[in-house]
Every structure is written in structure tokens, then in C-alpha cells.
Amino acid sequence: MLSGLWSSILALLGVFLQSVGEFRAETQEQDVEIVQKYLKNYYNSDKRNSGLVVEILKQFFGLKVTGKPDAETLVMKQSTCGVPDVGEYVLTPGNPRWENTHLTYRIENYTPDLVSPLTFTKVSEGQADIMISFVRGDHRDKYPFDGPGGNLAHASQPGPGIGGDAHFDEYERWTKNFQDYNLYRVAAHELGHSLGLSHSTDIGALMYPTYLRGDVQLSQDDIDGPSGNPVQPRGPQTPQVCDSKLTFDAITTVRGELMFFKMRTNRFYPEVELGLQAAYEMADRDEVRFFKGNKYWAVSGQDVLYGYPKDIHSSFGFPTGVAHECWSYDEYKQSMDTGYADEFPGDAVFQKFFHGTRQYQFDLKTKRILTLQKANSWFNCRKN
């Protein structure tokens, strides 16, 4: 059952939304510049202590701590919430909370991106507890917006003055679907701040600071946080990479990066079903294809291409029962290879096959299994 505070958030969010309708860096120098700009914008940090702050940030985001900018640290490039990840936002005794239980709000203006506003009850003039507005650049709260992408919105913790106010960057294109930025999802997150919630370190939580596509779903961390009682941070609820029982749903390269998929893939690809079984990249088309059962999806970036999912039988010519057989499909000829078992294609030295917690290294020339390893050996785990 949802806590009372989350019920308040969802109720306030519903009224608000009715009123408005529904690469990674190429050089190390660019990486450093991105990190320094991020720290300056959100943490008032100079170059002298930036290494320490990077370590703290990476611990918060669940990344490997090195104190140096790297590909993992570049999560900073993603669109994000503008509230700094500092301790005073945690719901613990002594931190600000609304003293009264009946809160008023007022929407100062509307974004023209979403049409057909509906009738709702609001404070039409004067000062409300929660003032909601769409603004650009410097809007006199010491946290100017930075244009399209980057800082999407921010909200103040409960208190007098601007306390509880939520500001949305009008330079963004707000939508009611998953093109650009979904207003419902961002508003739900920001109104959580307006009611006193902190950021969560659980990547599956609504209160995780980085914007992720997908339907609004409350994680256990979201539900536990607003209970009103001091709670210890739950931390990321992601699988432990060195767990000896760890398995993967799918593995493939994506734009030069090796990607391991496990559960929650709809956080990045909201139109792709959970429970993937296989994936591969077509780099020359900038597409990744995901397979589940007899269906597959073609994805570019985070968007599923038009007309997908499709059926593997009609598209590739798979028989109705594949079972334990191995097949090769020629993307250029758009047909299955013939004589596949005798003429294994490819020019790699070997290929790896994953099944459960194991990975098999297959030699293309001898057509034999060379080694058997744990599937998570890619993560420098000790033997377990």
C-alpha cells in the first residue's frame, strides 16, 4: 500500500497535469571539461577539490570510484534534475517539512507544448505553498536553466518563500509520450522534492536524479522514503555483478560499448518488452535488435523503429521450432545462410556463447569449445 505522502504526490501531480495537458566524450580533455562544468553548476566546486567530489558523486550513482573522469562519470552528460545531491535533502529529524497538512499551490503559467488544459481547482492569485512555473535561463533563484537538455527542472524543499516551488525549463520540449521529455515523469519527480523527498540511489526509483524514459513506477525505495520515519538509504537495487549466480538477459555492442542487459531494460528502451533473450548490433545502420520469443525490435538510440516488433518467422525465415539448433542470417542477402553447420561465417578468432551463469568460448576454425568461464568474468570478479 502506498504511503500517505506518495498519495499526496500523486494527487497533486494529477491536478497539475490536468491543468497543462497531457556519447560518450571524444577526448579526455572534453571529459574533464564536462566534469568541471557539472561540479561548478551543481556543487560550487573548484578544480582543487573536484577529484574528491567526483568520488562522492560516483559512489552516489553506484559507479566505480577512481577520482578521475571516465566513461562512467559521463552520466553527468545525461539530462538530470537540478537539485544537488546533498545531505540536507534527506528526510531525517530536523530537516524541513511542511508544518501544515493542507497545502495550496498555484501554477504561474503554462507551457504551450501540451495543449487542451482541463479544468481544475487552484489558487488563482497570491502566494501559494507550491508555485509551479515554466521559465527560461536565469529566473532569480540562483539556479539558472541551461537550455535544451541538461537540467530539465528543479524544485525546492518545503519551507517559506520559494520553498516547495517547482520550475521547469521552457526551452525543453515537453510531451505526454516518450519523445523528448515526458512532463508527467519529470513533474512526479520534482513534486517529490516539493514535498520533502531526497534523491534515491536506486536506478529503478522515480527519485533517481537522472532522467530515464519509461512509465512512472514507484520502487520500494520510493515507497519507503516518504514514510516520515528515519530510514537508511537502500542503495542501488541492481544485481551484484560478482554474484556467482548472476545471469544476463542479453549481451551486445552498442555504438562501440559492450552492453550487458539484466531486467529493467525498459528504463532505457520503454517500448521493448522485459525478459529479453538475445540482442545484436547492426553498426552500419546504427541499429540494435532485441529478441524475445518469436518477436524482435529494431532500436536506434532509445527509439523503436516504425513497424516493430516483427515476427522472426516471417522476417528471417525461422522454422516454427528452433530448439537447440544454431542459425546464421545474412543481413545483406536478407536470408538464412545455407550449409551453415559446414561453413561457419565470420572472421573473428572466436565467439562467445552465454547460457545461464556460464560463457563458452568457441573456436571458429576447429568448431570446438575452448574454455568455459563464469558469465560475469568480464567484470574482473574473483573466482566464485
Swiss-Prot record:
Localization: Secreted, Extracellular space, Extracellular matrix
Residues engaged in binding Zn(2+) 2: C81, H189, H193, H199
Pfam families with a match to the protein in the record: Hemopexin, Peptidase_M10
Entry note: cofactor: Binds 4 Ca(2+) ions per subunit.
Residues annotated for Ca(2+) 3 binding in this entry: D146, G147, G149, N151, D169, E172
Chain residues in the propeptide: 26-88
Segments for region (Disordered): 218-239
Sequence motif Cysteine switch, residues: 79-86
Binding site residues for Zn(2+) 1: H139, D141, H154, H167
Cystine residue pairs: C242-C381
Major localization listed first in the record, in broad terms: secreted
Protein residues bound to Ca(2+) 4: D249, Q277, D347
One cellular-component annotation, GO: extracellular matrix
Signal peptide: 1-25
List of residues binding Ca(2+) 1: D113, E170
GO biological process: collagen catabolic process; extracellular matrix organization; proteolysis
Active site: E190
Hemopexin repeats, residue ranges: 273-319, 333-381
Entry similarity comment: Belongs to the peptidase M10A family.
Domain notes: The conserved cysteine present in the cysteine-switch motif binds the catalytic zinc ion, thus inhibiting the enzyme. The dissociation of the cysteine from the zinc ion upon the activation-peptide release activates the enzyme.
Protein name: Interstitial collagenase
